[in-house]
Amino acid sequence: MVAKGSDFETEIKEEIIVAEPRRFKVILLNDDYSTMDFVVEVLMVIFNKNFDEALGVMLKVHNEGRGVCGIYPYDVAETKVSQVKKKAEESGFPLRAILEEC
């Protein structure tokens, strides 16, 4: 931007700093009732994992009690958690997902 005066011109520079959005991990938690097939389906449908990726995350959830499904900005991560909850309730499973800030 240029400001004009009677005898001079002054250039004013504006610096805009854009911060990176905070990122959140969506984590599936193991339970004793959700089937392995259902967890793989959730990972493929909601998190767009291919079969091999979904199988790997499902096994991590099964063996370690939790597994990271993906890392997203807050609004996307929150939506994914809600989608997991809805699909689990509709299917009669107690599968849960949580958020953790990276």
Curated annotation (Swiss-Prot):
Involved in the modulation of the specificity of the ClpAP-mediated ATP-dependent protein degradation. GO terms for biological process: protein catabolic process; proteolysis. SUPFAM superfamilies: ClpS-like. This is ATP-dependent Clp protease adapter protein ClpS. InterPro entries: ClpS, ClpS_core, Ribosomal_bL12_C/ClpS-like. Belongs to the ClpS family. It comes from the Bacteria. Pfam families: ClpS (PF02617). It comes from Wolinella succinogenes (strain ATCC 29543 / DSM 1740 / CCUG 13145 / JCM 31913 / LMG 7466 / NCTC 11488 / FDC 602W) (Vibrio succinogenes).
